[in-house]
C-alpha cells in the first residue's frame, strides 16, 4: 500500500500526509491504510479549491491554470494540511476578519463566497452514515459538511453542494480511479474494511488492558474514545434526523419512526375464495412416463422416432372419453384433438420412412384449441383516431383464490428422490489450483445429492420442452407442429432411458417481439384421477384413454390412464428462460456453498468433506406450522433446489412483487431477533405492498403461508 500511495499521489500531498501522521504519532509503515486515507482527503480538499476564484464584483468564477487572471482572490482558504498551530492561526484570522463563529474542531476549508467553514469527508462506507458521524462530532450548524464516497455518491448539508457539477464530477472521477487502482493491486478490500466501526458493546462492564486498547483502535473514525462513541450511539435520535431529511424532500412527507417489537407484526392476510388451480406449463408430480430402456432403434435421438417407440411400449389404449370437462371450453374438441394425434401417428407408422417432424392437419378442433383466427383484427391507429369512444378493453380484476393443499404436496414431491439420475457428473479436466480442487469437490458432492431429485427431472423436462418449442416456433411458424415431450435419464444400473410424457401441438408462431405469444395444446399422460381434486385441474379437460398394469405389493393391478389436455401459451422470453433452467442447480449450489463457507470460517479450515459426510448432523430446511424443520444435508440441497425450480416454473409478477416486498419485512424481523432494535415507518404500507401480490398464484400463496409460520416462530 505504501508503494501505491507514493506512486499514485503528488509528492507534495505525500509529504504533507507524512507530516500529519508524524504529528499524531502514527507510523505510516504500519498504518498504511490511514496513510492512503489522509492522502486521498488532502487531494479532495485541494481539488475542491482548485480553479475557483472571486472576481472584483465578488462573484465566484472558474479559471483554468495558466490564465492571465491568476491574481484573482482564491475562493477557498485551505486549512487542511497545515500543522495544527498554523491551521488555528488561519482559522482565528478568518474569524476576526469575517466575524464568523469560531469552530470547535479544525475545519478543512473556508468559503469566502458563502462565508462559511467547510468540513470535507471522504468515506468508504455509506455517505449518510459518515455524514451523521461528522454532524454529531461538530455539533455546529455554521460549519458546512460535504461528504464524497468512492462509489460516486455525495451528501452535503441541506443538499447544498457548493461547487458546480463539473468540479464535483472531477473529484468523483478521481476517487473512482483511486478505487480501481487499489482494486487492481488487491488493496481495496483491506482499505475499505479498515474504516468500519465495530458494533456497539451493550454490556456496561469495565474494559481494561489489551481489550481496552483494541476497543479504542476499533472505533469508527472521528471518535476519540469508547465513551465518546457510546454516548453518540445512546443519544442518537433517528426521528429528528430522518424527519429533517424528509422535510427537505417535500412538505407532504413525514415519517415518525415507530419501534418494531415482538408484538408489532401481524400475519399476512391470505385471500379467501375458491381453491387455487395448477398453472405450470407441464404436469409435475402427476406426470406419467412411457419409457424405453437402452434405446438403440433406428433414428434414436430424433424426438418423433423416440416418441413412436415409447408409444409402442403401451398396449392398454381404449376409446377415449371425457371424465373431467373444462368448464369454459368445448370439450369434444379436446377429445377430437387427441384422436387426431393417435390417427396421425398411426399414419406415420404406415409410411415407409418416418419423417423427422410431423405437422398436424389444420382441423377445426385444432384451430379452435390453438385460438386460430381468434385474435381481434388489428387496425392502424391513424385509421381510427376520429372514433369518439375509442378505448382499451375493460379487463376484469383477477378472481381471488385461496391456498390449496396440493401445492405443498407438489413441493414435497419435488424434494424427493427418484430411482433415476437426471444429470451427469461433468467431465472436467484436471484441477490446476487448490481452490479449483475444493470447488470441484463441492460440485461433485452436491451433484450426487441432487442428481436423482425430482426437481432435477423437472429442470431437464423444462429445458427440453422449451428448447423444442422455441425451435419449432422459429422453424415452422405457420405449422401446427407435433412436439413430443421427452426426457432422458439413467437407471440405477446405469442404463440409458428415454421417456415420453405426452405431446404438445404448437399454434401459429410469428414471434417478432420477446413477449409475442405462441399458443399450444398440451396432452400429458397421468395416473391421477382428476375427480379427487377437481379444483386443481380447473384449466384442464381430462380424458380417460387406457388402462395400465401397475406392479404393486399385491401383484399387478389395472389402473385407468388419463390424458390431461389444456390450451396454454408462452413467449420467446419465457422459453429462453425455460431453456436456462439448469441455472437453478447453480443457484442452489451457491446457497449451499455459503453455508459451507460460514462453517469453514468458524472452524478455520475447509469443512466441505465433513459437511457432506457427517450424516448425523442436521440443518434447518424451512418453517412449518410445527416449527423449524431440520434434516440431512442432502435434503437441504434438494429443498433449496426445489425452491429455485419452483421459482422458475411458477415465475410471475405476483412472485416478483411478493419476494421483493416480503424480504423487507423479513429483514426487519431478523433485525429484531438479533436485538438490533429496528424501527419502521409506514409498516401498514409495507403490508399493503406484500398483500397486493397475494391474489391467486399457488406458489406465492404457499410462500406467504410459510412466511406466516416463520413470523409465528421467529417472534414466539
Swiss-Prot record:
<keyword id="KW-0945">Host-virus interaction</keyword>
<dbReference type="InterPro" id="IPR001009">
    <property type="entry name" value="PA/PA-X"/>
</dbReference>
<keyword id="KW-1262">Eukaryotic host gene expression shutoff by virus</keyword>
<keyword id="KW-1048">Host nucleus</keyword>
<dbReference type="GO" id="GO:0003723">
    <property type="term" value="F:RNA binding"/>
</dbReference>
<comment type="subunit">
    <text>Influenza RNA polymerase is composed of three subunits: PB1, PB2 and PA. Interacts (via C-terminus) with PB1 (via N-terminus).</text>
</comment>
<comment type="function">
    <text>Plays an essential role in viral RNA transcription and replication by forming the heterotrimeric polymerase complex together with PB1 and PB2 subunits. The complex transcribes viral mRNAs by using a unique mechanism called cap-snatching. It consists in the hijacking and cleavage of host capped pre-mRNAs. These short capped RNAs are then used as primers for viral mRNAs. The PB2 subunit is responsible for the binding of the 5' cap of cellular pre-mRNAs which are subsequently cleaved after 10-13 nucleotides by the PA subunit that carries the endonuclease activity.</text>
</comment>
<keyword id="KW-0540">Nuclease</keyword>
<comment type="similarity">
    <text>Belongs to the influenza viruses PA family.</text>
</comment>
<feature type="binding site">
    <location>
        <position position="108"/>
    </location>
    <ligand>
        <name>Mn(2+) 1</name>
    </ligand>
</feature>
<dbReference type="GO" id="GO:0004519">
    <property type="term" value="F:endonuclease activity"/>
</dbReference>
<keyword id="KW-1191">Eukaryotic host transcription shutoff by virus</keyword>
<keyword id="KW-1190">Host gene expression shutoff by virus</keyword>
<dbReference type="InterPro" id="IPR037534">
    <property type="entry name" value="INFV_PA"/>
</dbReference>
<dbReference type="InterPro" id="IPR038372">
    <property type="entry name" value="PA/PA-X_sf"/>
</dbReference>
<dbReference type="GO" id="GO:0075523">
    <property type="term" value="P:viral translational frameshifting"/>
</dbReference>
<dbReference type="GO" id="GO:0042025">
    <property type="term" value="C:host cell nucleus"/>
</dbReference>
<keyword id="KW-0378">Hydrolase</keyword>
<keyword id="KW-0597">Phosphoprotein</keyword>
<keyword id="KW-0464">Manganese</keyword>
<feature type="binding site">
    <location>
        <position position="80"/>
    </location>
    <ligand>
        <name>Mn(2+) 2</name>
    </ligand>
</feature>
<dbReference type="Pfam" id="PF00603">
    <property type="entry name" value="Flu_PA"/>
</dbReference>
<feature type="binding site">
    <location>
        <position position="120"/>
    </location>
    <ligand>
        <name>Mn(2+) 1</name>
    </ligand>
</feature>
<dbReference type="GO" id="GO:0006351">
    <property type="term" value="P:DNA-templated transcription"/>
</dbReference>
<keyword id="KW-0255">Endonuclease</keyword>
<feature type="binding site">
    <location>
        <position position="119"/>
    </location>
    <ligand>
        <name>Mn(2+) 1</name>
    </ligand>
</feature>
<keyword id="KW-1157">Cap snatching</keyword>
<feature type="short sequence motif" description="Nuclear localization signal 1 (NLS1)">
    <location>
        <begin position="124"/>
        <end position="139"/>
    </location>
</feature>
<feature type="binding site">
    <location>
        <position position="108"/>
    </location>
    <ligand>
        <name>Mn(2+) 2</name>
    </ligand>
</feature>
<dbReference type="GO" id="GO:0046872">
    <property type="term" value="F:metal ion binding"/>
</dbReference>
<keyword id="KW-1104">Inhibition of host RNA polymerase II by virus</keyword>
<dbReference type="GO" id="GO:0039694">
    <property type="term" value="P:viral RNA genome replication"/>
</dbReference>
<dbReference type="GO" id="GO:0075526">
    <property type="term" value="P:cap snatching"/>
</dbReference>
<dbReference type="GO" id="GO:0039523">
    <property type="term" value="P:symbiont-mediated suppression of host mRNA transcription via inhibition of RNA polymerase II activity"/>
</dbReference>
<keyword id="KW-1035">Host cytoplasm</keyword>
<feature type="short sequence motif" description="Nuclear localization signal 2 (NLS2)">
    <location>
        <begin position="184"/>
        <end position="247"/>
    </location>
</feature>
<dbReference type="GO" id="GO:0030430">
    <property type="term" value="C:host cell cytoplasm"/>
</dbReference>
<feature type="binding site">
    <location>
        <position position="41"/>
    </location>
    <ligand>
        <name>Mn(2+) 1</name>
    </ligand>
</feature>
<dbReference type="GO" id="GO:0039657">
    <property type="term" value="P:symbiont-mediated suppression of host gene expression"/>
</dbReference>
<keyword id="KW-0479">Metal-binding</keyword>
<protein>
    <recommendedName>
        <fullName>Polymerase acidic protein</fullName>
        <ecNumber>3.1.-.-</ecNumber>
    </recommendedName>
</protein>
